[in-house]
């Protein structure tokens, strides 16, 4: 009997330890598998949303006292200086809410009640993809949790909240299969390459558990751009991780930047980055905020001198910019709007644009909407570029990767209201000496760090830049327009390393309007300032070549939905397909 009792005890002991081993193994395996094995072996890989606090709204959608079926989730929330950006994710079959149906909801962090402390209408709602939206809400009082709701469905659960001053916010896989990560918070110096060995890139769902993320080498780091070696498992699972895997940057021995940067892949990623023939000879990229009333003239004019493709990075516009771009696209212009809500990131936006344009554009210019390329010779832009690069290379036996064009700064020219015929005709008085330059670059010539200071990029060692003779090409920069337009520059400057005009910092910068100080107060003599020489070169050419001879209207003054072309042209058939060769007068 004693022997049987001892065996009974030993059996239960062995069973206990066996059961404990099975349970611990299951827990370990289960925790590891969701962040690694499911990713590695191609199973569905989804982000885990963590709520800032546990309240009834964080676990169910609240409509009065009764929860309703979840229609959307707030994937991420970013607190910008003067507004809040919320990224919404819908089920694939769900109907997306309109701006009128959504509300910005502000909940008390300390009060567990689901009753909203405040509700406001969103400033804007943009559809990014078929099942995703970007909602811009006004900043609320401190200490409030911000989410969205609808009048019919109640309040939706809040998503994880991030502060803008420390964040990885965008990520693209380049043609060479490296990952380019765009970050805020490293505070690196302008135009300096930093020691990459002090950092590493991390890929995964939850960066608070470093044992469960993939790590990779940082190849270069400069300003706010980090280039990483992409893990092979990420490249091989491209289709599965496109909207799931996030990327961030970790300081070795320190912390990891919070991240909302989900991997994006270029359409030609992994292919030859230098195709024999690209679709477009000349393209233009810009970053703009509330430039709807000037965008039509800017696009149409540059189309008439030979630009074929436009990339518009919309930096939190709340005017009709999206509608103007849509109308231009419908009229036949190859133009796209890229939502770029990130404040003071013009350098990063231009680098992002250069990556996107690499497979499509032989040359791409980076200019603002108040800047117009003027070709005094009457040639088209691609002809000027071809002449510049062929002449230089025949003598120097080097490759030209960047063309730098001098900028003439125009003043109000005696006007007090926005000119009806457009800026190219209305403003005719400027400063004598050029201010700075802008660049037209060959995307594959850019240094891998993608360093730029808005006006030009750093190039690879086997490429050089050239300065263009102002008799061949200049930029007419309508910098100091009528006060109604000029005062908008006091809102915020878009460049990272440029102080806002309202700040006392760097008051003497060339970016500012001399003599204005830090307050948007119109000087009595504003309309006559910055006028040292009369220059009607571009005005004359625009009126001669682009005005309708019947009514003298310019293309951007009409409501036509057809693509504009010069009124005076020479036409000839060059192949079986009817083609036209235009020559400006």
Question: Residue spans of the language-model regions?
Answer:
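Long, charged/polar, low-complexity intrinsically disordered N-terminal extensions
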Residues: 1-135, 139
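Short amphipathic, basic-aromatic surface patches that mediate peripheral association
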Residues: 87-95, 182-191, 233
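Catalytic-site signature of metal-activated, phosphate-bearing donor transferases
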Residues: 2-44, 128-136, 141-166, 172, ...
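Short beta-strand/loop segment that forms part of the nucleotide-sugar
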Residues: 308-316, 338-339
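Short alpha-helical elements within RNA-binding folds
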Residues: 98-109, 196-206, 301
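Short, acidic, metal-binding catalytic loop of nucleotide-sugar glycosyltransferases
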Residues: 300-308
């Amino acid at each position: 009997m004693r022997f049987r009792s001892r065996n009974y005890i030993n059996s239960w002991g062995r069973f206990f330890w066996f059961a404990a081993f099975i349970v611990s193994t299951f827990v370990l395996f289960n925790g590891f598998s969701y962040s690694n094995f499911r990713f590695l072996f191609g199973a569905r890989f989804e982000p885990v949303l963590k709520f800032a606090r546990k309240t009834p709204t964080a676990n169910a959608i609240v409509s009065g006292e009764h929860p309703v079926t979840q229609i959307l989730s707030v994937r991420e929330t970013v607190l910008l200086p003067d507004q809040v950006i919320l990224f919404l994710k819908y089920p694939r079959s769900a109907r997306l809410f309109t701006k009128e149906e959504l509300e910005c909801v502000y909940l008390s962090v300390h009060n567990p009640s689901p009753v909203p402390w405040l509700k406001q209408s969103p400033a804007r709602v943009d559809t990014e993809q078929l099942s995703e939206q970007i909602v811009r809400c006004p900043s609320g009082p401190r200490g409030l949790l911000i989410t969205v709701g609808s009048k019919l469905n109640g309040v939706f659960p809040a998503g994880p909240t991030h502060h803008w001053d420390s964040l990885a916010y965008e990520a693209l896989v380049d043609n060479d299969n490296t990952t380019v990560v765009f970050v805020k918070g490293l505070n690196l110096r302008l135009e300096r390459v930093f020691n990459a060995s002090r950092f590493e890139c991390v890929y995964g769902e939850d960066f608070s558990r470093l044992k469960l993320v993939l790590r990779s080498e940082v190849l270069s780091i400069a300003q706010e751009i980090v280039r990483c070696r992409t893990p092979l498992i990420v490249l091989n699972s491209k289709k599965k991780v496109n909207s799931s895997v996030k990327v961030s940057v970790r300081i070795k021995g320190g912390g990891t930047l919070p991240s909302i940067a989900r991997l994006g892949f270029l359409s030609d990623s992994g292919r030859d980055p230098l195709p024999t023939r690209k679709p477009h000879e000349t393209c233009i990229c810009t970053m703009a905020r509330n430039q709807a009333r000037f965008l039509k003239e800017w696009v149409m004019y540059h189309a008439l001198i030979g630009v074929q493709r436009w990339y518009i990075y919309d930096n939190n516009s709340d005017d009709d910019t999206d509608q103007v771009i849509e109308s231009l696209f419908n009229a036949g212009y190859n133009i796209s709007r890229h939502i770029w809500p990130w404040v003071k990131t013009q350098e990063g936006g231009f680098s992002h644009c250069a990556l996107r344009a690499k497979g499509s554009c032989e040359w791409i210019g980076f200019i603002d909407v108040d800047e117009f390329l003027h070709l005094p010779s009457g040639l088209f832009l691609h002809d000027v570029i071809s002449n510049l690069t062929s002449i230089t290379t025949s003598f120097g036996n080097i490759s030209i990767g960047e063309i730098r064009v001098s900028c003439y700064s125009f003043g109000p020219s005696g006007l007090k209201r926005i000119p009806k015929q457009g800026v190219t005709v209305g403003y005719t008085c400027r400063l004598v000496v050029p201010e700075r330059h802008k660049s037209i670059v060959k995307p594959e010539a850019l240094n891998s760090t993608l360093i730029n200071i808005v006006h030009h990029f750093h190039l690879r060692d086997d490429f050089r830049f050239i300065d263009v003779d102002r008799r061949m090409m200049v930029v007419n920069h309508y910098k100091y327009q009528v006060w109604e337009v000029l005062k908008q520059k006091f809102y915020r400057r878009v460049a990272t390393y440029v102080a806002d005009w309202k700040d006392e910092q760097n008051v003497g910068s060339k970016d500012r309007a001399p003599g204005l100080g830090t307050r948007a107060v119109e000087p009595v003599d504003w309309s006559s300032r910055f006028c040292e020489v009369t220059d009607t070169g571009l005005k004359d050419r625009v009126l001669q070549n682009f005005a309708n001879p019947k009514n003298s209207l310019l293309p951007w003054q009409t409501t036509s939905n057809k693509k504009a072309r010069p009124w005076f042209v020479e036409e000839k058939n060059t192949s079986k397909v009817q083609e036209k060769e235009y020559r400006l007068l």
